[in-house]
């Protein structure tokens, strides 16, 4: 289930053309929600680093699958 979710979200990201090269999953979370899953998407830095500028953070909870928190940074 988690694997399908990841692939589905990554497909959506690709379709949205965010230019993300990688993502990071961090379990055990934020705001007291221990079942939170985080997706951090990065765009390449000027030096070609895989993890460059953080462009988006998505918070997903198993309890409420539609509860998404988007944080866009400059």
From Swiss-Prot:
Assigned keywords, A-Z: Mitochondrion
Annotated source species: Marchantia polymorpha
Presence of the UniProt keyword Mitochondrion in the record: yes
Protein name, as recorded: Uncharacterized mitochondrial protein ymf34
GO cellular component terms attached to this protein's record: mitochondrion
Compartments it resides in: Mitochondrion
